[in-house]
Amino acid sequence: MKVRPSVKKMCEKCRVIRRRGRVMVICSNPKHKQRQG
């Protein structure tokens, strides 16, 4: 899980979602998991 000030899609399988007010990226590739904050 990467924590970044700006989250972006890193590939076509990445999905940007909101969980508990946080913007997150979920993907089939675990390296692409990101959270804003």
Swiss-Prot record:
GO molecular function: structural constituent of ribosome
Alphabetical UniProt keywords: Ribonucleoprotein, Ribosomal protein
Keyword Ribonucleoprotein: yes
Pfam families: Ribosomal_L36 (PF00444)
GO cellular component: cytoplasm; ribonucleoprotein complex; ribosome
Superkingdom classification of source: Bacteria
GO biological process, one term: translation
Family (UniProt): Belongs to the bacterial ribosomal protein bL36 family.
Name this polypeptide is given: Large ribosomal subunit protein bL36
